[in-house]
From Swiss-Prot:
It comes from Sulfolobus acidocaldarius (strain ATCC 33909 / DSM 639 / JCM 8929 / NBRC 15157 / NCIMB 11770). Belongs to the type-2 OGG1 family. The keyword Zinc-finger does not apply. The gene is ogg. The lineage of its organism: Archaea, Thermoproteota, Thermoprotei, Sulfolobales, Sulfolobaceae. Pfam families: Ogg-HhH. This is 8-oxoguanine DNA glycosylase/AP lyase. The keyword Lyase applies. The active site is at K128, D146. It comes from the Archaea. The record marks K203 as: Important for guanine/8-oxoguanine distinction. GO terms for molecular function: class I DNA-(apurinic or apyrimidinic site) endonuclease activity; hydrolase activity, hydrolyzing N-glycosyl compounds.
Length: 203
């Protein structure tokens, strides 16, 4: 089933079109990189659609607000975890102006090292969110393993729960093998799997 999706010319064209957008983001300015960081912080433990809606609601105001004001805006936007994410976003906004320069310098040399740096130094970001962020700014060699992808792996008969870094890397290794077999970059594989389960490409 997954192979047939990857070989589907129309779907593959849509995925490759998204990949071009990611690669263009890599050349974009700090504002775009910061936007993607905000989106990935909001996407954690939330749906992409909810996160995207809230990001658009707060993005042009967040740099001028304190934590409480960010929390109120998130609540107004309908976002569920408004207090927790306000705390993360308030810390993240202090990185504005340094996000692209700092991360690109590392990621251009080693994408896995860049992910480790992000997951270690940016509050509210784990391996999945760091991989998602890096993919969205043009680095396609890391797996984004959300609940849809985890369900796909579990349906293969592999009981991984992603409760540790070790399990994430194990799942990523499996997905990398599948991606290589299908001749697609692992950073795009989740788009095919997400489409298989939801019939949409949004990420």
């Amino acid at each position: 089933m997954l192979r047939s999706l990857v070989l589907n010319e129309k779907l593959r064209a849509r995925v490759l079109e998204r990949a071009e957008e990611f690669l263009l983001n890599n050349k974009a300015d700090e504002e775009v990189w910061f936007r993607e960081l905000v989106l990935c912080i909001l996407t954690s433990n939330s749906s992409f659609i909810s996160a995207y809606k809230s990001m658009n609601y707060i993005l042009d105001k967040i740099l001028y607000m304190d934590e409480k004001e960010i929390s109120i805006l998130l609540q107004e936007s309908g976002y569920r975890f408004y207090n927790l994410k306000a705390k993360y976003l308030y810390r993240a906004k202090n990185l504005y102006g340094k996000v692209k320069k700092t991360i690109k310098e590392i990621a251009d040399k080693d994408q896995m090292q860049a992910r480790e740096f992000i997951a270690t130094h940016i509050y509210g970001i784990g391996y999945k969110e760091a991989s998602h962020f890096l993919r969205n700014v043009g680095y396609l060699d890391l797996a984004i393993i959300d609940r849809h992808i985890l369900r796909f792996i579990n349906n293969l008969g592999i009981p991984i729960k992603l409760k540790s870094k070790r399990e994430y890397l194990l799942a990523e290794s499996l997905l990398r093998s599948i991606a290589n077999n299908l001749n697609v970059q692992v950073g795009l594989l989740d788009l095919f799997i997400f489409f298989k389960q939801t019939n949409t490409i949004v990420k």
